[in-house]
């Protein structure tokens, strides 16, 4: 019968049915703002399925810390109980995972056609891996192999304090502290962060993330500069994670922004910044970095998790 799998972001939710063997079917996307809560959104998806295809269990990925039965999402005003959600949807079990745990569990099932390597390095089989991805927020996770199985290590790495690497970034971070109090990595490396960077580099011009995206697509010099700074900052965070995990299995860049701009990412200062760690430059030069170009990697990761924990 399969599992309900759902990737619940701050803006959109994608639902599907995971079949035995890891196949993902019946993928549907929803705008979160069109529903008062997650229960109504998932009920809409399940209600459209033929009764014989309705699953009895679910694995859901959530863009929020998971510290118990009650979950409070960060980038949308949704709070819910996992046990109550299962009862409301008539499911025997609902397993919540951090959204980037789902991304991490996808890494072992991605093929070369799902990835675009940027820079050098060769992955070491079964070594730790890292995934980081800017979108509505900035997600991070590690993946380590213990006793023959992969285990995701999640946290809130997007909220670490952003450290500047040059005078221009120092000015940007100072503006971030003025605006937000604490200038975390997510304040600069996310959709809203890209818009903030554009304003910081252009006399405070206020644009939405979508408007900055339009200017990037049009080839505007100022927008492309903001994107390059964005990718360099991402390089700083990615290399910090690579050092923390000794991620010789590779660093994978996901999220909704980078895969949209692969050409600009390849030409950016990301990899130079990634390796720019002084005495540890040779260490990082050996670690490969990839952009995840696969469709729905989180759903594939949830399917892999469901298969392993059926």
Pin down the residues of each PLM region.
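Glycine-rich phosphate-binding loop of actin/hexokinase-like ATP-binding domains
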Residues: 117-184, 269-275, 279-281
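Short, glycine/charged-enriched secondary-structure capping and boundary segments
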Residues: 19-20, 73-76, 110-112, 145-148, ...
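ATP-dependent carbohydrate kinase catalytic cores
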Residues: 93-124, 209-228, 236
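ATP-binding/phosphotransfer module of carbohydrate and carboxylate kinases, centering on a glycine-rich
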Residues: 1-50, 54, 168-310
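Short, acidic Gly/Pro/Ser/Thr-rich loop/turn segments
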Residues: 13, 65-67, 137-141, 196, ...
